[in-house]
UniProtKB/Swiss-Prot annotation:
Pfam families: DUF3313. This is Uncharacterized lipoprotein YdcL. A lipid is attached at residue 21 (S-diacylglycerol cysteine). Disulfide bonds: none annotated. It comes from Escherichia coli (strain K12).
Amino acid sequence: MRTTSFAKVAALCGLLALSGCASKITQPDKYSGFLNNYSDLKETTSATGKPVLRWVDPSFDQSKYDSIVWNPITYYPVPKPSTQVGQKVLDKILNYTNTEMKEAIAQRKPLVTTAGPRSLIFRGAITGVDTSKEGLQFYEVVPVALVVAGTQMATGHRTMDTRLYFEGELIDAATNKPVIKVVRQGEGKDLNNESTPMAFENIKQVIDDMATDATMFDVNKK
């Protein structure tokens, strides 16, 4: 009896956790390893009010820099396409992210191909490390994490959340040390169920929001 009661309580806790306590920021177990250090990241909000993890070197002075070396955004690690998230969608997500983010960053400083003494180096990645199958959660091992909404399991409906994870940093070209780091996740449009293929449009707004935040970021609001 105790075992049965405990199982019921555990299941209830799992449902409550999924229905009301889903984190809006990237949790440590989702860090991809793309950045060398995550320990100094602090929770804050982006220019458009989105929750993010960010670190800015206290001595950072943007007036000391005159250009940014753009390194194309990549997938880290390289994803395996699935029946739900196909290669064409993955390619479109990556290409669009590069286009929008490059344009946004170019509004901050001129982009160059070779670093000078006053250059910043940008590097970024769409990351995906969701492998948890605990409780009522299910994660696809692809950069766009698909999470089963456990609160709808009782009805036979499994609406799928879509999430895009991103990690990026700006590095001082002279010291080769990071001066700004950002880790964030964004929620796209839901899929009807686990059999519904994801379309680029499901995640487009997440990318648009990232680009807007990159354009509007105020370094004085650290």
